[in-house]
């Protein structure tokens, strides 16, 4: 008589125990777990039981649903955000999580579509809903003025999005930058002049002509010419333009930890310099640097007689 094999069904696990175990796994792996991880940790649990437990945790707002290159990820939800997303469906939670992960640099709707794999019409609907709840906000990026990036409502946009102190309503403040450029150079020139008038030996004069970026920053702040708060990084950006113009040179010295203006035991020092050789006339004239010089000829669309650069130079 042939032996009859009887398949033994595993006993039904307590749904609460399954949910608690999934929560424990999420705490062990804060960056998220896949369904395969849950299956490996609980091999005796049927797929349907896992799905029921996961869906219940998602509906209660205890888990976040993410999408990665390897598939779906489940991550423990921040308790502060759990109340914000109460009553939202899984698709809305997924979009919110993608925007949250983007931080203060924001994310375009096209990238949200790619990461969520949702239709664009559905994404636009979700974005409007989240904006109406003041959970997210749309910010125009200086990198692409016609495109908006989305970020959490309470975040301050990154400098790469707003352009920092040099932009106002997505417009580059060229006059403001020029004023800062002039004032920074004026301060360094004054420092160099004071060093020359001291009648010390050349080495002491040279060392005395240097100023740290913190000194320049403090001088600009005391002038009160800026309506926005400038950082030392902003001032160093201006000083770098002076270096590129050949008006200023920079040196880096070692500094004690905690010294004002030092970073990682180093300090940047700047001083005004004079050009070694005066520029020749052809370089100073617009023709010497004109980008359309080869196309310029009398009777043509570009000609010396209607050159706007030459007119401006002569008036100057």
Swiss-Prot record:
Principal localisation: nucleus
Amino-acid positions noted as binding [4Fe-4S] cluster in the UniProt annotation, renumbered to this chain: 287, 290, 296, 307
A Pfam family of this chain: RNA_pol_Rpc34
Subcellular compartments: Nucleus
Any one GO BP annotation for this protein: positive regulation of interferon-beta production
Molecular function via GO: 4 iron, 4 sulfur cluster binding; double-stranded DNA binding; metal ion binding
Superkingdom to which the source organism belongs: Eukaryota
Keywords (A to Z) from UniProt: Acetylation, Antiviral defense, DNA-directed RNA polymerase, Immunity, Innate immunity, Iron, Iron-sulfur, Isopeptide bond, Metal-binding, Nucleus, Transcription, Ubl conjugation
GO cellular component: RNA polymerase III complex
Modified residues (N-acetylalanine): 2
InterPro entries given in the database record: RNA_pol_Rpc34 (IPR007832), RNA_pol_Rpc34-like (IPR016049), WH-like_DNA-bd_sf (IPR036388), WH_DNA-bd_sf (IPR036390)
Disulfide bonding pattern of the chain: none
Cross-link (Glycyl lysine isopeptide (Lys-Gly) (interchain with G-Cter in SUMO2)): 5, 7
Domain notes: The [4FE-4S] cluster-binding domain adopts a globular structure that serves as an interaction hub that connects the POLR3C/RPC3-POLR3F/RPC6-POLR3G/RPC7 heterotrimer to the Pol III core.
Function of the molecule: DNA-dependent RNA polymerase catalyzes the transcription of DNA into RNA using the four ribonucleoside triphosphates as substrates. Specific peripheric component of RNA polymerase III (Pol III) which synthesizes small non-coding RNAs including 5S rRNA, snRNAs, tRNAs and miRNAs from at least 500 distinct genomic loci. Part of POLR3C/RPC3-POLR3F/RPC6-POLR3G/RPC7 heterotrimer that coordinates the dynamics of Pol III stalk and clamp modules during the transition from apo to elongation state.
Similarity comment text for this entry: Belongs to the eukaryotic RPC34/RPC39 RNA polymerase subunit family.
PANTHER family hit by this protein: RNA POLYMERASE III DNA DIRECTED , 39KD SUBUNIT-RELATED
Assembly with partners or alone: Component of the RNA polymerase III complex consisting of 17 subunits: a ten-subunit horseshoe-shaped catalytic core composed of POLR3A/RPC1, POLR3B/RPC2, POLR1C/RPAC1, POLR1D/RPAC2, POLR3K/RPC10, POLR2E/RPABC1, POLR2F/RPABC2, POLR2H/RPABC3, POLR2K/RPABC4 and POLR2L/RPABC5; a mobile stalk composed of two subunits POLR3H/RPC8 and CRCP/RPC9, protruding from the core and functioning primarily in transcription initiation; and additional subunits homologous to general transcription factors of the RNA polymerase II machinery, POLR3C/RPC3-POLR3F/RPC6-POLR3G/RPC7 heterotrimer required for transcription initiation and POLR3D/RPC4-POLR3E/RPC5 heterodimer involved in both transcription initiation and termination.
The protein's name: DNA-directed RNA polymerase III subunit RPC6
Protein's gene: Polr3f
